[in-house]
A protein has these predicted regions:
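C-terminal helix-coil-helix/basic helical segment that borders enzyme active sites and/or dimer interfaces
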Residues: 34-41, 270, 291-325, 338-346
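Glycine-rich flavin
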Residues: 38, 46-56, 60-160
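Glycine-rich beta->alpha junctions and the first turn(s) of the following alpha-helix
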Residues: 206-291
Length: 380
């Protein structure tokens, strides 16, 4: 699998962080994302230009060390970037998470080729990236079997199998995968490229939301992947390095969506407060719960930092609890928003309709709410 030398050798620009990054993201969202949200939602338009633009600002390089093209600021500003994008569009917020997840995989590998040659391009958005770890995460939780087999061969592995849905990918996109090493009980993790020989990308389903996420079924048929592209083999310990950051950054999606639902409820209350006051999950009480989750997730993000360490069991438990709470708040906030809106919320394609559909994704994307509760039960 090859990546163009011209891409690898491009000079790195200085990325923004903290307040400067957040302000620049708000401006980019207002100018380039907000006008396209309806087309992203209803027509499945993929916002590639916006995704590349926020990469050049620093949306994907916060958890990446400075020596590999990032800012070295850690998971916290990455989570905040996902949160702020998700306030406007969960599809794009999800893809911001997908890309950050791939950056996180590369940040935590010991593979020098991936860290030195590929990570700087992913950290700045020159190479767009997704994550194919839904199946592996469910496998390691005892929910389903791994779907790819890796057969060792000279120089690497031959991959065969299928990943049902992988998001934010295309012919030139990168994404993480996991496979069982044939004849063993061991597993590997690696980086695949959408255009690699032996890989077919298929779009053959229509989703009720998040249509603009470039989500494909991935069919591997005798696809060769070299040792240069392997993140870890075996990958048991490596998964422990990436797990907490992978899960916690998803909380940003729930934070952003819930905040927007609250803001919309308050806007509706300007004319309907006299009747909406009798509803449950009113904006003020939702805001209090949201702020509690926000502060907790920010604290956990600071504890995780920029990786390279396995977090304590207590930190991991809090991360999983926070992710579950993000799902629950998203569902409650979007349902309350629909009830606050009334009949206008029932109009197809309205913002209220979209936020309700998006909220179910927060609760269903891996790790789904039922997955999280299963893991928490096993940790009791």
């Amino acid at each position: 699998m090859q990546v163009s030398d011209t891409i690898i050798k491009q000079p790195q620009e200085k990325l923004l962080t903290d307040a400067a990054l957040m302000q620049s993201l708000k401006e980019a969202i207002a100018q380039k994302l907000a006008p396209d949200v309806t087309n992203i939602d209803l027509k499945g338009i993929y916002p590639e230009e916006f995704l590349r633009d926020i990469g050049s600002l620093g949306a994907y390089g916060q958890g990446v060390s400075t020596e590999y093209g990032g800012t070295g600021r850690g998971v916290l500003p990455a989570l905040k970037a996902i949160e702020i994008v998700s306030e406007t569009c969960l599809s794009t917020g999800f893809m911001t998470w997908c890309h950050n997840a791939c950056s996180w995989y590369l940040q935590n590998t010991d593979n020098p080729f991936l860290k030195e040659q590929i990570l700087p391009q992913v950290a700045t958005g020159k190479l767009l990236s997704g994550t194919g770890l839904s199946n592996p995460m469910k496998h390691f939780a005892g929910i389903e079997k791994i779907k790819i087999i890796a057969t060792p061969c000279e120089g690497g592995y031959i991959l065969n199998g299928t990943l049902p849905w992988v998001s934010n990918i295309g012919d030139q996109h990168l994404f993480g995968i996991s496979a069982q090493i044939e004849g063993t009980d061991n597993y590997l993790m690696a980086i695949a490229q959408g255009g690699m020989q032996g890989l077919e990308l298929k779009q053959d389903v229509h989703f009720i939301a998040l249509e603009g996420t470039n989500t494909f079924r991935c069919l591997f048929r005798n696809a060769f992947i070299s040792h240069d592209w392997v993140l870890a083999a075996p990958c048991d310990r490596y998964v422990e390095y990436i797990k907490a950051g992978f899960i916690l950054m998803q909380v940003g999606m729930g934070l952003g969506l819930t905040q927007n639902c609250i803001d919309l409820m308050r806007r509706i209350d300007r004319t309907k407060q006299h009747v909406n006051q009798y509803l449950d999950d009113r904006p003020d009480e939702m805001e209090d719960e949201l702020e509690t989750l926000r502060l907790k997730s920010y604290r956990l993000a600071e504890a995780i930092g920029h990786g390279r360490e396995i977090v304590s069991k207590e930190i991991l438990r809090e991360v999983i609890e926070s992710r579950a709470t993000a799902s629950e708040l998203s569902l409650r906030a979007s349902q309350s928003l629909m009830l606050h809106a009334g009949a206008i919320g029932y109009v197809h394609g309205s913002v209220y309709d979209r936020r309700l559909r998006e909220s179910y994704f927060v609760a269903m994307v891996t790790p789904a709410l039922k997955h999280l509760r299963k893991v928490l039960a096993s940790m009791s």
